[in-house]
């Protein structure tokens, strides 16, 4: 009885240890997947851009650069090849030598500049939109300035007719004076002709006096 009793509790101990190991393995695998970092395509483009070789970067040199960056090249060899093919098909990389994933690769300057230009254009358009609103205000101010100039110009036009009217008025008195001067000598001439007419009745008065004298003689 004493021999069989201690054997029973020893059996469940190894059964408890096995699930702990499985959990630890799962956690380690999950940690590796999480710390994988950026995608392969980004790492490849960075490695190609960093190289100064004119002929391009070979696959072996690419793998070395990726390994130096901390990327597991041996496990992700197929991913590197697929990433290279996709980058070549997109136009971000240009294959200078070889075919497929093997060969040497170079950054496509046109594609890189094309990606940079739209960003620069958007930033430039955003900057240009802001001064456009500010530029509208000076236009309004310019419109008011032109209106002020037009109002200033109009009195000048009004002054010219006034000056012309003044000049005409100044000229007209001269004419009036001339007419008055011409008319003035005529009136005394008329008066001179009238005076001899008034003298004629004086000659008729002696004629009426003659009959009075004859009547006195008859008496």
From Swiss-Prot:
Sequence ranges assigned to domain H15 in this UniProt record: 36-109
Residue(s) carrying Phosphothreonine: 18, 146
GO CC entries: heterochromatin; nucleosome; nucleus
Sequence positions bearing N-acetylserine: 2
Span list, region Disordered: 1-41, 92-219
Pfam families assigned: Linker_histone (PF00538)
UniProt cross-references to InterPro entries, sorted A to Z: H1/H5, Histone_H1/H5_H15, WH-like_DNA-bd_sf, WH_DNA-bd_sf
Citrulline carried by residues: 54
Chain's role: Histone H1 protein binds to linker DNA between nucleosomes forming the macromolecular structure known as the chromatin fiber. Histones H1 are necessary for the condensation of nucleosome chains into higher-order structured fibers. Also acts as a regulator of individual gene transcription through chromatin remodeling, nucleosome spacing and DNA methylation.
Annotated family: Belongs to the histone H1/H5 family.
Name this polypeptide is given: Histone H1.4
Gene (name only): H1-4
